[in-house]
Amino acid sequence: MTDAITLPSQYDPKQTEAKWQQLWESSGVFHADPNHPGKPYCIVIPPPNVTGSLHMGHAFEHALIDVLIRYHRMIGRNVLWLPGTDHASIAVSTILDQQLQAEGTNRFALGREAYLKRAWAWKESSGKTIVGQIRRLGLSVDWSRERFTMDEGLSRAVLTAFNRLYEAGLIYRGQYLVNWCPASQSAVSDLEVENREVQGHLWYLRYPLTDGSGYLEVATTRPETMLGDTAVAVHPEDDRYRHLIGKTLRLPLMNREIPIIGDPLVDPTFGTGCVKVTPAHDPNDFVMGQRHRLPMMNLMNKDGTLNENAGEFAGLDRFVARKQVVARLEAEGFLVRVEDYKHTVPYSDRGKVPIEPLLSTQWFVKIRPLADAALKALDRQHSPRFIPDRWAKVYRDWLVNLRDWCISRQLWWGHQIPAWYVVSETNGEVRDDTPFVVAMDETAARAKAIAQFGEDIELQQDQDVLDTWFSSGLWPFSTLGWPDDTPDYRRYYPNTTLVTGFDIIFFWVARMTMMGQYFTGKIPFRDVYIHGLVRDENNKKMSKSANNGIDPLILIEKYGTDALRYSLVKEVVGAGQDIRLAYNRKTDESATVEAARNFANKLWNASRFVLLNLEGQTPGQLGTPRRQDLTASDRWILSRYHTAIQTTRERIESYGLGEAAKGLYEFIWGDFCDWYIELVKPRLQGENAKAKRTAQQVLATVLDGTLKLLHPFMPHITEEIWHTLHQVADNEVLAVQPYPKANRRAIDPDLEAQFSLLIETIRTIRNLRAEAGIKPGLYIAALIEASAEEAPIFEAGAADIQHLARLESLTIGSGLQIPQRVFSGVVGKSEVLIPLAGVVDLEALVSKLQKEGDRLRKEIQSLTARLNNPNFVNKAQPEVVAAAQAQLAAAQQQLAIIEHRLQSLGVDDKTQP
């Protein structure tokens, strides 16, 4: 007999995880080779922002991706998981600006060069933290291909994309109304605007007609903008005002004459049906202003204060100006009344202040041609495929309703716009009429400018940077070497799958599909797997603003990486569904993750048992069992094992990752650990060498395959156990072993059904013993009143039932003589009974059951009264009412069981035996 191969008595996640993360990386097992013969499977990581550290949403997303990546690597695909980070222009700028403010300065005082030096230092620090956290998660990425959205290769891709779009007439510079964030002093895209419902006011103002014949009343939620009014509009079909169209009004406070116009955009039911028109500060007014050729009077400075066009109110903050304008209007008799009014106000998602619609010269992408091409791919080729498919409609609707994309940001951190103004043509100033050239670099720009304006020129590069989503939109192909035709680009583009949250379908997914389709002629990924959000213990979305996030590293330190990863994946009940993570903020404990750690410990202990009983032999030395030597329990566990292989593969292939994780849990904990290992112990401890070896072969086969099945979900612990099981060198790892394939001939549904009946029988006897208070170590008698079709199954499994239910005798038959004082339970079409006389104190048992019956009757009475109370049913939250109804049903069921038990003991209600 060889000395047993064993594992330590306890699993140490910290030691094991650190060891394998280092070995995986140093051995290069995750390095992608374009020449690998397997079919490509590529995912580029949704790049985390370099804004500090990863949060639980990242851990969730990365755990899902790693399941897909490890699985496809093990089935022989040519796998690339490319890591990287995003420069996050607005987010990082906000952090740096806050730091500078705390130091009593700002970026303008610091200067662009020093500011960018500081930004790069932040990126290095934050990026290092994020990479360390990704490594801590044990993700199987190819670190040799790590990318950053502002590294040299990706910057060249951004410059190329901008130049090509500009040359095609799809990028232009124009004066339009943009969403302006006074806090960050930058334009923001429509998608970076958060619409909030607020309780505000509606001010009714009186505008006098210049001919002295009367006045019009207008209603507004922003009275300070009336200083920039250039018209009052009414609906052309509104009989109340149609006769006034073409007349003029005197603008209060400003004493300016403005026209009354008719426009179908006006809602006659809003306010008085007359609306003030401020084209430079409202999107609808801007449209009307263009249609009627109204002057565009900008009132705002970039910091949210009023400019010189506001007259005496110049220099005031917009909200201070609001109060003073209202006070003046009231003092001069122009304020009619004020009403409370709930309405929607757009806020900057980053700056957290109300957006100011501002007339500004910006750079735009002409989006319609790009969106139409993406729509064509979706409608004709169903590309990309969304999982779940309901998101395809959301994606489509958004593409249909897109407006031109403002891509310039008044920031310094990011890709500086590759446009150079020929300022020598406008006295050294950059003005709206200053000519410019677009080029890849200043040398090329100078050559273009000289060709147009001669040698004596002065150039100045545009100071703005591109919207972060511009470079992110190129991520699936720029990371692979585009615009060059590299081996990686040829082999791994289009990507296979994108895994991302639904909250950035608009920000990111659509940008990538439009950019990919335009520049490469292909949608950049085949599938888009949309996952939900991670919610906290109160079912609220985790976010920085709510201050309810959970640091993944806290739970990793406490429970281990595998436990966190597995718990997050297992919680997914369906593609796109949110998950809930139980967490105690006082103790940093999570029942959800603790359950996954317990599962890891269960696997570890079961593996220790198997290894000890293999007596130093590896699966290779033991060989495979011969079918004629297999017992029924061997054939059952092998059937369950191959069923698990089949269902796990099917679920992963169809993105049912949560279902796959749950299925493996049930097979490993239930079928293998709780049942087969217990069933096989007598043979391992017996004298029959042949039976023992067959049991060892089955144990080794199932454990080896189970570790492979579970590896994508819990990579570290499975790698450690597999390595110990096979006693192989460090460079031979589970991560690249073939994933098990189901042997359909080994799957026996009839045998599985028979064992389900036997297992349910054992479980029922155990429950009856517990209800009766029978000591666990006491061997008792049991009877099975068996149906004709089930009797042979019970007979064949009698030895297993007796062994696992601790029975000294088991009688199986039909029409049995049933003794008095029994507990019974139904199993299938049969009944299981255990006699209690001489086994328990019957008087004490009756007393215990009666007390429990009395308690349940009181509970039922209380719950019934509560649910019959209309005040409770009508006023309580629906989930509270549903919980009370469920509690009542459970209590009634428990009482029925108690009463049945008392009758079995010969007790009618509360009478003694």
From Swiss-Prot:
ATP binds at residue 544. Its EC number is 6.1.1.9. It catalyses: tRNA(Val) + L-valine + ATP = L-valyl-tRNA(Val) + AMP + diphosphate. InterPro entries: aa-tRNA-synth_I_CS (IPR001412), aa-tRNA-synth_Ia (IPR002300), Anticodon_Ia_Val (IPR033705), M/V/L/I-tRNA-synth_anticd-bd (IPR013155), Rossmann-like_a/b/a_fold (IPR014729), tRNA-bd_arm (IPR010978), tRNAsynth_Ia_anticodon-bd (IPR009080), Val-tRNA_synth_C_sf (IPR037118). Keywords: Aminoacyl-tRNA synthetase, ATP-binding, Coiled coil, Cytoplasm, Ligase, Nucleotide-binding, Protein biosynthesis. One of its GO terms (molecular function) is aminoacyl-tRNA deacylase activity. The keyword Nucleotide-binding applies. GO terms for biological process: valyl-tRNA aminoacylation. One of its GO terms (cellular component) is cytosol. It is found in: Cytoplasm. Pfam families: Anticodon_1 (PF08264), tRNA-synt_1 (PF00133), Val_tRNA-synt_C (PF10458). ValRS has two distinct active sites: one for aminoacylation and one for editing. The misactivated threonine is translocated from the active site to the editing site. Monomer. This is Valine--tRNA ligase. The lineage of its organism: Bacteria, Bacillati, Cyanobacteriota, Cyanophyceae, Acaryochloridales.
